[in-house]
């Protein structure tokens, strides 16, 4: 395998490992810490830039692999049609067809997995942001619920105060009436 296909293979292995790490059922705090470390790291920014360039190179290798598979398949079909083709020539064509298909699948898998990992990472970031927003809204709801309970308690205390004020006024009126009658009796 040539050096550039070794690089593609290494990138494929890194993508598999990163996808497995991102897919692990980690607690929210750990997952948030991992995503924040990846998002905010200046080194990660450089790695993302290099990966974009590498993906473009892999796309070129993929196109070349498709072209090579088509060419090798046509050569093999022509060789099979020729009656003078030896068994060693056929095995040579089969070997070159195998290598061309291997390179095609290797590049295709690396491209596909890079798209999957990228989308999965973005979905995880969106999920973490949504969960943070949900937690903030829950704290607001709890605070408003506590405020609503306080307002409700204040209203019940107000109504109790109003009923006591009314009772006080009625008792004061009764007391005033009783004191008037007692004074009238004293005057007589």
Curated annotation (Swiss-Prot):
Gene Ontology process terms (BP): endoplasmic reticulum to Golgi vesicle-mediated transport; intracellular protein transport; protein localization to endoplasmic reticulum exit site
Transmembrane in keyword set: yes
GO cellular component terms listed in the entry, alphabetical order: cytoplasm; endoplasmic reticulum membrane
Pfam families the UniProt entry points to: Bap31
Membrane topology: Multi-pass membrane protein
Membrane-spanning segments: 6-26, 43-63, 110-130
InterPro entries given in the database record: BAP29/BAP31, BAP29/BAP31_N
Transmembrane helix listed as a keyword: yes
Cell compartments where the protein resides: Membrane
Keywords annotated in UniProt: Membrane, Transmembrane, Transmembrane helix
Name of this chain's protein: Uncharacterized protein C9E9.04
Lineage: Eukaryota, Fungi, Dikarya, Ascomycota, Taphrinomycotina
